[in-house]
Amino acid sequence: MENVKQTIRAPRGTELQTKGWIQEAALRMLMNNLDPEVAEKPEELVVYGGIGRAARNWESYQAIVDSLKTLESDETLLVQSGKPVAIFKSHEDAPRVLLANSNLVPKWANWEHFRELEQKGLMMYGQMTAGSWIYIGTQGILQGTYETFGEAARQHFGGSLKGTLTLTAGLGGMGGAQPLAVTMNGGVVIAIDVDKRSIERRIEKRYCDMYTESLEEALAVATEYKEKKEPISIGLLGNAAEILPELVSRGITPDLVTDQTSAHDPLNGYVPAGYSLEEATKLRAEDPDRYVQLSKESMKKHVEAMLAMQEKGAIAFDYGNNIRQVAFDEGLEHAFDFPGFVPAFIRPLFCEGKGPFRWVALSGDPEDIYKTDEVILREFAHNEHLCNWIRMARQQVEFQGLPSRICWLGYGERAKFGRIINEMVASGELSAPIVIGRDHLDCGSVASPNRETEGMKDGSDAVADWPILNALINSVNGASWVSVHHGGGVGMGYSLHAGMVIVADGTEAAAKRIERVLTSDPGMGVVRHVDAGYDLAVQTAKEKGVNIPMMK
């Protein structure tokens, strides 16, 4: 695909480029995904996560933009792996856009077949929020990362990470949240990345405190701050598959160890040990098969080092990039001896229908987001943990692209919040409509046996009906755009997941759609976990009145 050097930035204000606010929202969010403040490699249409793209190629991108500008408010645009393929007459309450990205028949659901199709221009990798146009930069994963490290602190360190050292790697669009999430929980973190640009980007956006190319300096600073029980985040330039084994050989054991490199994609997401970034780029182009094999061997060493640290007392967990699976496939029989982050720390939240709920101010005015922050602080004042998050986010999170906010809200809370936001748009308190969406990593919208659905109580880890049902109910309930993707987070063959976005434009019709969608969407999370036999989900369903025919 041809790289194009152009700066894309979503329009701001209330002047429409399209025939309605829902079409306008889709257009602005597509463009926002490719804003240089937001996207990792906008010239390649790559938003985050290795090769997670917003559109298949530049011709398709322009065709999507043109289609959205002429789309009527009773029509629906269909997008197949980043390419607009049809516009059909529908109705005003139907989604304006339906997207299916990276989906392959199971027997062919592997990277090799995907790459054949990609090279022919027939498919793109949509990751989760890249191809579904609701990525908001690193903030999008920040609260989930904060919650994960917070729960680790509660389970293992008396409620705080003060006086602890976390070791991790991967400072891309997702992993870049880790340094700030650890320091928000009071801890010290060394975060490794092979790409200097990634570390510098996190420092620029205040997600990471300092940069070093010296392991000795990183360890000295980490030790100093750990002893002082003060937080600091250290971005260390290097390769985790080299640095972790070196630390093991020195007998240095962190308190926590995890990883968020893009190991889900051995070709485009991971750099083999012994190679500089430049050397790796050259090898990737000249001999991709050898590159993949070297990557997989390095991942095995990486996981071996994490297991060695676990044996010495570190709390180790997989952060959802499928690195354990690769190591296992390479012959490391005990690769799954440390858990994934969802069963270890997050699943109780899923049982309550909670997940990474986000909203974006189409006006471009940060004041609109600050006003919505006040809504959270007022309406959910009883939830001190949530309110603390909002206060910290206001102080420490720098917006990327259109102003946005994320917080984990549960069943009932999402619909309540959406209702209030729509009323604020209607009254003029907010200067333009608000886009409400979420990550595909949510309570009822993903099947991913090595991540979100790992170790389900009833063994239903691989059942993929749930994300499809989620997309179907959100579509019929009037979500503004709905997406079904394959391979996000953990790579080809390992996940199916669905996304939704709903626009609060202040109309009565929007109010009804919001009520329906923001009830059924988290409701699917409660239903999914009731079906798997989780008592907390059953309790939630009974308390909230979720109608589940065979619930006991």
Curated annotation (Swiss-Prot):
Biological process annotations from GO: L-histidine catabolic process to glutamate and formamide; L-histidine catabolic process to glutamate and formate
Coiled-coil ranges per UniProt: none
GO MF terms held by the record: urocanate hydratase activity
Residues at the active site: C407
EC number: 4.2.1.49
Details of cofactor binding: Binds 1 NAD(+) per subunit.
Alphabetic keyword roster: Cytoplasm, Histidine metabolism, Lyase, NAD
Pfam families associated with the record: Urocanase, Urocanase_C, Urocanase_N
GO CC aspect terms: cytoplasm
Tree of life domain: Bacteria
Compartments in which it is found: Cytoplasm
The keyword Protease is assigned to this record: no
Catalytic activity, as annotated: 4-imidazolone-5-propanoate = trans-urocanate + H2O
Binding of NAD(+), residues: 49-50, 127, 173-175, 193, 239-240, 260-264, 270-271, 319, 489
Cofactor: NAD(+)
Entry-linked InterPro entries: Urocanase, Urocanase-like, Urocanase_C, Urocanase_central_sf, Urocanase_CS, Urocanase_N, Urocanase_Rossmann-like, Urocanase_sf
First-level EC class: lyase
Recorded metabolic or biological pathway in which this protein acts: Amino-acid degradation; L-histidine degradation into L-glutamate; N-formimidoyl-L-glutamate from L-histidine: step 2/3
Biological function: Catalyzes the conversion of urocanate to 4-imidazolone-5-propionate.
Family to which the UniProt record says this protein belongs: Belongs to the urocanase family.
Name of the protein this chain belongs to: Urocanate hydratase
Native species: Bacillus cytotoxicus (strain DSM 22905 / CIP 110041 / 391-98 / NVH 391-98)
Lineage: Bacteria, Bacillati, Bacillota, Bacilli, Bacillales
Gene: hutU
